[in-house]
Amino acid sequence: MGSSSNGGVPPGFRFHPTDEELLHYYLKKKISYQKFEMEVIREVDLNKLEPWDLQERCKIGSTPQNEWYFFSHKDRKYPTGSRTNRATHAGFWKATGRDKCIRNSYKKIGMRKTLVFYKGRAPHGQKTDWIMHEYRLEDADDPQANPSEDGWVVCRVFMKKNLFKVVNEGSSSINSLDQHNHDASNNNHALQARSFMHRDSPYQLVRNHGAMTFELNKPDLALHQYPPIFHKPPSLGFDYSSGLARDSESAASEGLQYQQACEPGLDVGTCETVASHNHQQGLGEWAMMDRLVTCHMGNEDSSRGITYEDGNNNSSSVVQPVPATNQLTLRSEMDFWGYSK
C-alpha cells in the first residue's frame, strides 16, 4: 500500500476524524483491503518508534498538528498468550482505565483503549504526557481476520494538556506582580511620609529652656497665634509710682527681647520664648495696670480724671484728655495677659 506524502493534501487541510469515522471508515477499509481516495494515515510499527518520533513520521500536509494518526499491527507479547507487546526502545505503553465502547446510531462498532507512555522499563517507569487512543473493531466486523494474529488497529497519539502546571505558572506570575506592586506602593508611601516630615519640620519649634513646645501643625494650638502686641504702652502723661515705672521699663525691655527672638515674617506666637523668670513675676503687675486702665475707660466722657497723692498727703486731681485708643488693641492685650495667668 502506498503512503501519503506531505504534498498529497490540499493547502489548509486539517485531519480531525471522529471515533466513529476512524472505526467505521478508515479501519474497516484497512482490514478489508479497500483503496482510500486519499491516504492520510500511515502504517507504523509501534514497537520501533518513540512517541516524539511520530510527529515527523505521521505528519499530514504543512499545517501544524497537535495529534497524529497511524495504523499499527498488534503483535502478541508471548506466542501462547493474549497480551500485546507495546514496548519500545525508550519505554513502554501502559493501558489505563477501562475500554470505551464506540457506537454508531444503532449498534456497537468497536472499542477504544487508552494508554500512557512511560520511560524506562516496567514496572518502574517514569510517566510522561504522551497519550494514545487505540481503536479496534469487533470480531463480527472483521471477517478476514486471521485467528493467529490480532489484526490491525488505528491509533491517535497526542500530548496531554497539563492545565495544573499552566494555572500554577499563571498564579505564580500574578503573585510576583502583586508583590512587586505592593513593594512599589510601600516605597511610595515611605517617600510621601518622608517628604511630609521634611516639609513640616521647620514649623515645629521646640524651646530649649523650658517644657513648652510650639507645634503649629496641631489645630488645637491655633489660639496661641496672636498679633504682635509686645510694644511699649503709650504714655498717659503721669507716673503711678517709681516701682511701676521700673516695672514698665523692665517689661518694655523684655518685650524687645521677644521681638528680637522672632524671625522676620513670623508672628509672636510662632517665636521661641526668651523671657526670664522675672518677666513671669511682672505679669501680675501688668494685669493690675490693665484693670486700672479699663476702669478709667468705662467713663462716659472722653476725658479721664486721675487722682494721686504727693509726699505731703495732698491729693489733687488731674483731668487730661486722652487720645483715642484702639479698643481692639487694648482688648487683645487684656485677653493675652489674662490667658498668660
UniProtKB/Swiss-Prot annotation:
GO biological process entries: plant-type secondary cell wall biogenesis; positive regulation of DNA-templated transcription; positive regulation of gene expression; root cap development
Localization terms from the record: Nucleus
Keyword list, A-Z: Activator, Developmental protein, DNA-binding, Nucleus, Transcription, Transcription regulation
Superkingdom as given in the UniProt entry: Eukaryota
Gene3D superfamilies associated with the record: NAC domain (2.170.150.80)
One family name in Pfam for this protein: NAM
Keyword Cytoplasm: no
Comment block on domains: The NAC domain includes a DNA-binding domain and a dimerization domain.
Name used for this protein in its record: Protein BEARSKIN2
Organism encoding this protein: Arabidopsis thaliana
